[in-house]
Amino acid sequence: MTTRTTVKLAALALLAAAGLAAPGTAQAQGDLVVYCTVQEEWCRAMVQAFEKKTGIKVAMTRKSSGELYAQIKAESANPKGDVWWGGTGDPHLQAAEEGLSLEYKSPMLGELHPWAVKQWEQSKQRTVGVYAGALGYGYNTKQAAEKKLPELKCWSDLLNPKLKDEVQVADPNSSGTSYTLLATVVQLMGEDKGFDYMKKLHKNINQYTKSGAAPAKAVSLGETTAGITFQHDMVTFVVQGAPIQVVAPCEGTGYEIGSMTLIKGARNLENAKKWYDWALTPEAQSIGAEAKAYQVPSNKNAKAPKEAPDFSKIKFIDYDFAKYGSSAERKRLLAKWDAEVKNLPK
């Protein structure tokens, strides 16, 4: 038996012992069903800490934000989940607009940064910010040197012909990260020029992944030269020693407010509220760094990991969460991307 197989089997045994569901599944039984949209390690660590603190048994499903939004919508007549934790804020806002979530005022609101509370206010109390992350990209410095690429600093640098079939990004239909990219480019450049950029970028794309964080791993392994993700996803692999340069694009960039939502029709609502309140505490928000996740936490008393991107050095656009978090605008932009970009020949 290989070491990799042994480790995998051991991990599965630990999951079973902890009462967690395997990735992408949810157990039928349980005192709480959590839909999770951060990396698997962070999801597991949160569940284990909550179970230890409360004694409440948790069944967890991990999927990308676009997938979970679609799942919650599909299950709305017979909800299976109780709380949706993590993932880009736009799909959470869309769920709120469509009446898929519940109003809730947590006693922890007073401890949160204004941007987290604004998310709650904008959603009419149906979702709240739990962390923030800056959009950007990363590139494998060894591969860049082999291709004799200049230092990459801007969005425009990803259009270099030397990067043909060497850039990876998620599909915005399934990934909140990639939808944030689409909305960012449209706001930064204007819609016509923004879609022109996406068409030119398409020529260099080798794969549209399902998960927004997947390109970071691909860059770390040398499977692609560059990947567009949230910057903290790249930092995770930089900390592990991967030859990655993280880029905050010179033209400016968008950002996410990772959010949390109580699902309308939750079968375990009181336990879901306990998770919601606990997930906003400094104690819970410190778990991200322990799981090698480097987002900026929403609780003012929680310390941002020292490895987290320095927001003071990043040029941010004035991201319009109200407009681009609406269901109508999301559907319109995705339909346009599908029609004008996704199936273009390379």
Regions found by a protein language model. Name each.
Residues 37, 41-44, 80-223:
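Extracytoplasmic ligand-binding site segments that recognize negatively charged/polar headgroups
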Residues 102-111, 127, 156, 242-254, ...:
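Short beta-strand->loop
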Residues 263-321:
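Mature extracytoplasmic/periplasmic domains
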Residues 29-94:
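Early extracytoplasmic/lumenal segment of secretory-pathway proteins
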Residues 138-143, 183, 257-268, 287-288:
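A bilobed periplasmic-binding-protein/Venus flytrap-type ligand-binding module shared by bacterial periplasmic
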Residues 133, 197-202, 208-209, 240-264, ...:
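Periplasmic-binding protein-like
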Residues 90-94, 220, 225-243:
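A ligand-binding cleft/hinge motif common to bilobed small-molecule-binding domains
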